[in-house]
């Protein structure tokens, strides 16, 4: 049984849903509007009794049918209301009959009602103005700057006592000035302190006196009726410090007829002869002048009058007038639109499908012309083997030969072949035999020997320049090229000239061992072009090594070994030529950048490790001297 009993009962929660699923015609419009789909769906999702899947499917069908009926009824009501509104507001249609084309006067006229304007106005006390404007009214303390009663600087200028910021004792009583203004000295600390208990009797006595009675006595130190610092400023009877000041009578504030500075200066030492305050220290240094704190006003009303504040009008930024930009071409012509429609190059691309098999995919990746001389037929995962393969396929021609060949200055064929076959092999030294005449032979009869290095050639050329200048024939023009199979004949020197050339070295004084400064040019005898060629060649080799190995340690060691061998060969030639016993690293690294100096220093350390040279240094950070080691001529 795929349904439950409560579904079929007329009182069940899903009775209307089941009826809509199986007998839709039995449902009336009232039944549809009474049905609550939300509660019905909740009952289907979480039923009280387990239902079969087919039963829940039937109930969902009933829910859809009831929802469809509700939507259909709503659409019908909307259409009916729309038609009625449209019919009611048709243009040109008057619903009035023929006899009632004119409207009644009362229907189109508003009644005139004159109100009684003689009613008394409400009392002003009924309106609570303070309550309405209390939010917009600020307190006096918030909008008024705090102003201290001016401190009199006369007391501080004339050493009337120690009036520091921390003094709490009031000046001696009974001191007043004759025919002077009422001088009140208050500091920030005195205003904020409470009166002490020792002056309570004095405060009670002073409360009964008027302002003008305080200054009756003219003598200093006799009267006990008043003091310079009025206790009423300290007491709390007249309000807070920042409250409105009490109204003073005109007789209370007296203006001085003449300044009393002269009298006060004369009586500095005599009048105030009483003891100082216990907090003061003798001798008392005069306090700096504070003229900004003294305020003397001639009128009582202007005592607390503030200066008017300028009304600052907020400046409004002037709006920049917008510039109307109109396109010159407002519409596209038919040719442009047709060209855009016919151009479909941006949505069409070539079909590039991957090969169906992995082998074809590999052939496609490695079968291009750019990969033929770079990758072997089989994949080599070892980086060193791959580099050896590419090295064999792409022979390295020295840069100097390449440039000489391009410039039309190539030497004979066997010299070019020797450098082509062994571009990286360090060449052995060949002792120059300049003074021994050799018979001229053909190229075929000569044995194949290695060409001396460029460094040795430069040393030899520097030594025989003077000899060849007198015996060399004039050079041929630059446009004439040498033939590949011929060697230029050596200049024939008569034996008389040879004897004359051999005589001058005998007459020279004995040679002295050259200095380090003379030794360094022997290592730096390479021409500028040769140096540039070697530098470019080293940079290319470093880039190739970095690209191929990716930081392989073996390749790094190989590159350093090559630089070390070049340094050793240069040292051997230079020391053999000059006869020096040592060489300075500082002189060797002169006129070089930081990278080249570091490479030479590292080469020295490697040669020291191999016992090819010996390094000595007198003190830290001083020059390093290199001398030949036990294996200097063996390596």
Swiss-Prot record:
Biased composition (Basic and acidic residues): 526-536
Annotated signal peptide: none
Region of interest: Interaction with WAPL and PDS5B: 287-403
Keyword Calcium assigned: no
Matching InterPro entries: NXP1_M-like, Rad21/Rec8-like, Rad21/Rec8_C_eu, Rad21_Rec8_N, ScpA-like_C, WH_DNA-bd_sf
Keywords: Activator, Apoptosis, Cell cycle, Cell division, Centromere, Chromosome, Chromosome partition, Cytoplasm, Developmental protein, DNA damage, DNA repair, Isopeptide bond, Mitosis, Nucleus, Phosphoprotein, Transcription, Transcription regulation, Ubl conjugation
Record CDD domains: Rad21_Rec8_M_NXP1-like
Tissues in which the UniProt entry reports expression: Widely expressed with highest levels in testis, brain, kidney, heart and thymus. Lowest levels in skeletal muscle.
Chain residue ranges for the region called Required for interaction with SMARCA5: 126-282
Gene3D superfamilies in the cross-refs: Structural maintenance of chromosome 1. Chain E
Residue stretches of biased makeup (Acidic residues): 537-555
Region annotation (Interaction with STAG1) ranges: 362-403
Chain residue numbers at which the record places covalent cross-link Glycyl lysine isopeptide (Lys-Gly) (interchain with G-Cter in SUMO2): 48, 216, 418
Disulfide pattern: none
Residues with the Phosphoserine modification: 46, 153, 175, 249, 458, 549
Sequence segments annotated as region (Disordered): 258-285, 423-496, 521-563
A molecular-function term among this protein's GO annotations: cis-regulatory region sequence-specific DNA binding
Record's comment on post-translational modification: Cleaved by separase/ESPL1 at the onset of anaphase; this cleavage is required for sister chromatid separation and cytokinesis. Cleaved by caspase-3/CASP3 or caspase-7/CASP7 at the beginning of apoptosis. Phosphorylated; becomes hyperphosphorylated in M phase of cell cycle. The large dissociation of cohesin from chromosome arms during prophase may be partly due to its phosphorylation by PLK1.
Family, as annotated: Belongs to the rad21 family.
Subunit structure: Component of the cohesin complex, which consists of an SMC1A/B and SMC3 heterodimer core and 2 non-Smc subunits RAD21 and STAG1/SA1, STAG2/SA2 or STAG3/SA3. Interacts (via C-terminus) with SMC1A and (via N-terminus) with SMC3; these interactions are direct. The cohesin complex interacts with NUMA1. The cohesin complex also interacts with CDCA5, PDS5A and PDS5B; this interaction might regulate the ability of the cohesin complex to mediate sister chromatid cohesion. The interaction with PDS5B is direct and is stimulated by STAG1/SA1.
Misc. comment: Seems to bind calcium.
Protein name (database record): Double-strand-break repair protein rad21 homolog
Gene: Rad21
């Amino acid at each position: 049984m795929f349904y439950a009993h409560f579904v079929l009962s007329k009182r069940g929660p899903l009775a209307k849903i089941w009826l809509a699923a199986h007998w839709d015609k039995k449902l009336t419009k009232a039944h549809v509007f009474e049905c609550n789909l939300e509660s019905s769906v909740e009952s289907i999702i979480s039923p009280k009794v387990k239902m079969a899947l087919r039963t829940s499917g039937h109930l969902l069908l009933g829910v859809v049918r009831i929802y469809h009926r509700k939507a259909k009824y709503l659409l019908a009501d909307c259409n009916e209301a729309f038609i009625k509104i449209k019919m009611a507001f048709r243009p040109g249609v008057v619903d009035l009959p023929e006899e009632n084309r004119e409207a009644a006067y009362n229907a189109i006229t508003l009644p005139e009602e004159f109100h009684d304007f003689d009613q008394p106005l409400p009392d002003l006390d009924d309106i609570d103005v303070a309550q309405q404007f209390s939010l917009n009214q600020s307190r006096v303390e918030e909008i008024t700057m705090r102003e201290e009663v001016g401190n009199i600087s006369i007391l501080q200028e004339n050493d009337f006592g120690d009036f520091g910021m921390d003094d709490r004792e009031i000046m001696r009583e009974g001191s007043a000035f004759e025919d002077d203004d009422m001088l009140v000295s208050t500091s920030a600390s005195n205003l904020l302190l409470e009166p002490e208990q020792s002056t309570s009797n004095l405060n009670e006595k002073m409360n009964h006196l008027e302002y003008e009675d305080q200054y009756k006595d003219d003598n200093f130190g006799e009267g006990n009726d008043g003091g310079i610092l009025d206790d009423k400023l300290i007491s709390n009877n007249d309000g807070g410090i920042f409250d409105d000041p009490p109204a003073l009578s005109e007789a209370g504030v007296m203006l001085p007829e003449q300044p009393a500075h002269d009298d006060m200066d004369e009586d500095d030492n005599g009048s105030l002869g009483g003891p100082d305050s216990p907090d003061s220290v003798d001798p008392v240094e005069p306090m700096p002048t504070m003229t900004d704190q003294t305020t003397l006003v001639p009128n009582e009303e202007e005592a607390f009058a503030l200066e008017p504040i300028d009304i600052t009008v907020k400046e409004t930024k002037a709006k920049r007038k917008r510039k109307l930009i109109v396109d010159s071409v407002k519409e596209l012509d038919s040719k442009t639109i047709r060209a855009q429609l016919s151009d479909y190059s941006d949505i069409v691309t070539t079909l590039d499908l991957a090969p169906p098999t992995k082998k074809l995919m590999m052939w496609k990746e490695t079968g291009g012309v750019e990969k033929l001389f770079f990758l072997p037929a089989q994949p080599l995962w070892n980086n060193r083997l791959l580099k050896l393969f590419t090295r064999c396929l792409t022979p390295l021609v020295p840069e100097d030969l390449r440039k000489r060949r391009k410039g039309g200055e190539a030497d004979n064929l066997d010299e070019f072949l020797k450098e082509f076959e062994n571009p990286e092999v360090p060449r052995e030294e060949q002792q120059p035999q300049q003074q021994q005449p050799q018979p001229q032979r053909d190229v075929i009869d000569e044995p194949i020997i290695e060409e001396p290095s460029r460094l040795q050639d430069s040393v030899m050329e520097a030594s025989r320049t003077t000899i060849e200048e007198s015996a060399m024939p004039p050079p041929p023009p630059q446009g004439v090229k040498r033939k590949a199979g011929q060697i230029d004949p050596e200049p024939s020197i008569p034996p008389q000239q040879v004897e004359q050339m051999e005589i001058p070295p005998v007459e020279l004084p004995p040679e002295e061992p050259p200095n380090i400064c003379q030794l360094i040019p022997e290592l730096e005898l390479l021409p500028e072009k040769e140096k540039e060629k070697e530098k470019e060649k080293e940079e290319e080799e470093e880039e190739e090594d970095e690209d191929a190995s990716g930081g392989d340690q073996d390749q790094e060691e190989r590159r350093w070994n090559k630089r070390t061998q070049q340094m050793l060969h240069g040292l051997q030639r230079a020391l053999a030529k000059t006869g020096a016993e040592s060489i300075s690293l500082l002189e060797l690294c002169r006129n070089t950048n930081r990278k080249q100096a570091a490479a030479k220093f590292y080469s020295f350390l490697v040669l020291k490790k191999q016992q090819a040279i010996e390094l000595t240094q007198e003190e830290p950070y001083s020059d390093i001297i290199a001398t030949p080691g036990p294996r200097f001529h063996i390596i």
